[in-house]
Amino acid sequence: MELQVVGANALTVSETTFGREFNEALIHQVVVAYAAGARQGSRAQKTRAEVSGSGKKPWRQKGTGRARSGDIKSPIWRSGGITFAAKPQDHSQKVNKKMYRGAIKSILSELVRQERLVVVEKFEIEAPKTKVLVQKLKDLALNDALIITANLDENLFLAARNLYKVDVRDVQGIDPVSLIAFDKVVITADAVKQIEEMLA
């Protein structure tokens, strides 16, 4: 199959990478696993056994008129322990390489079908200036875009840092969440070839 390149000849690409059927279940599983892997999982609370304090009974069982109490660290007391205290845990989910690559291919194919994938011969700017990048995106009628280049361009990266709806990645830095998060994905012809090799 062929992809149209802005201002250049069409680019011949693999049908298996850019022409796959949309597999929503697979994409959902991989995106959820990716998001789960990004969780810090470091929260920690203390149970009544871990809270600092005396183990002495606050007052005698009977005769005071107050509710009976055996421990100042009880979960119903202020500054007591937490009943089901959260502990640090690993939220990551296992995703096979074949599944991950399949999800990326399915997303790329859907971007092509929805005409959200914009292929350019090259995408670079002379200086790390945000206004230069904004103008270049305007020329392509874009304002919400993920820019993928074969190698990370420092000028592009620095220029895009201050733009809320623009991100710059190299081929090694793409992930399923980023690919679906933007209205358009701008990709260079060299990056397309690299992605095909990476997902082969």
From Swiss-Prot:
Residues 43-71 are annotated as: Disordered. Belongs to the universal ribosomal protein uL4 family. One of the primary rRNA binding proteins, this protein initially binds near the 5'-end of the 23S rRNA. It is important during the early stages of 50S assembly. It makes multiple contacts with different domains of the 23S rRNA in the assembled 50S subunit and ribosome. Forms part of the polypeptide exit tunnel. Coiled coil: none annotated. SUPFAM superfamilies: Ribosomal protein L4. This is Large ribosomal subunit protein uL4. HAMAP family: Ribosomal_uL4_B. Part of the 50S ribosomal subunit. Pfam families: Ribosomal_L4 (PF00573). InterPro entries: Ribosomal_uL4, Ribosomal_uL4-like, Ribosomal_uL4_dom_sf. Keywords: Ribonucleoprotein, Ribosomal protein, RNA-binding, rRNA-binding. GO terms for biological process: translation.
